[in-house]
Amino acid sequence: MAEGENSVFFETFNRNKRSLSLNLNSESGRRVFEDLVRSSDAVYSNLRGDVPAKMRIRYDDLKHLNPAIVCCSLSGFGMTGPRATDPGYDYILQGIAGWMSLTGDPDGPPTKSGLSMVDYSGGFVAAISLLAGLHAARRDGVGGDCDVSLFDSAVTMLTYVAAWQMNSDFVPARMRNSSHPSLVPFQNFEAADGWFVVACAKEKFWERLVEAIGHEELAESEDYRTFSDRRVNREELLSRLNAIFIEKPVSHWL
């Protein structure tokens, strides 16, 4: 990066955006900001949950300037509650929300995902919330606050894993080779020269798999005929598939 130029990281997220720095604690900065609010559709912030109130950028602070303004806050833990003053970062939220207890191998440590998925998902939820707020404001002429938190977004994405645990005897755990907790085979497999993924999400995919690898007898076995059968006999089936896949390179299987 040459002096005076933006980093590749910065350009990844901000290319073609225009920016303006304002000190909202100064009279001149506040005046410019309020002029912008009068002619804008939305005010978006990505700050600690208690900061929008301190900076006076919530709907109640700005509605006298523009009754239709939509104020969206994306924070770690929301603008209210016991953790509103806590900062929130992707890595921390992956741990707090339980993602790391589900990621990695069973005999390894809790592991974060390779990408900042809490940050990304929180941003998507904030964008959807903001769009809903804008739709309502254009329909009714009244804006409001959109209070979005990384924590809420991350917990929401536990979906079926959380539902299984709360409604059955299922206990979420890290699965070897990134395998699916109920679908078998649905995971990474090692070939002679690398790794690839097999994903039998439907019975017909299982039938096609055994035909493609030349082991139709697996589909005929009563031990592997259905989803339930393969789940019960997971270890035995995976051992057989591992022995088959390791014999040939990835290009052969794909």
Regions found by a protein language model. Name each.
Residues 1-145:
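N-terminal helix-loop segment corresponding to the beta1-alpha1 unit
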Residues 7, 27-30, 34, 111, ...:
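Electropositive phosphate-/nucleotide-binding environments in soluble metabolic enzymes
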Residues 76-78, 150-155, 193, 201-205:
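Glycine-rich beta-alpha junction loops
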Residues 123-144, 156-168, 210-217:
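Oxidoreductase and adenylate-handling cofactor-binding alpha/beta cores
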Residues 168-175:
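Conserved ATP-binding loop and adjacent catalytic segment of the adenylate-forming AMP-binding
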